């Protein structure tokens, strides 16, 4: 009887541990590395890779999405630099 209890508890412990690891990885990748969906730290290198593959429809979709992200980052950088320059 006690062997069944130990096996059940061990199985449940491993199951909860895997669930925790999965949730932690998901939150970690979204919070600490928001550009991680491209496997890059900056959008410029991702944009250059996507531009090489833009012949395919998926490559073109990724190219557009990354170029929009890059434009938004550049606009935010310019706005921040203007605020620093004015103050």
From Swiss-Prot:
Main location per the UniProt record: secreted
MF (Gene Ontology): toxin activity
Signal peptide: 1-29
Cysteine pairings via disulfide bonds: none
Tissue and organ distribution: Expressed by the venom gland.
Locations listed in the record: Secreted
GO cellular component: extracellular region
Renumbered residue ranges of the record's region Disordered: 32-54
Keyword annotations of the record: Secreted, Signal, Toxin
Family named by the database record: Belongs to the scoloptoxin-23 family.
Protein name: U-scoloptoxin(23)-Er1a
UniProt organism field: Ethmostigmus rubripes
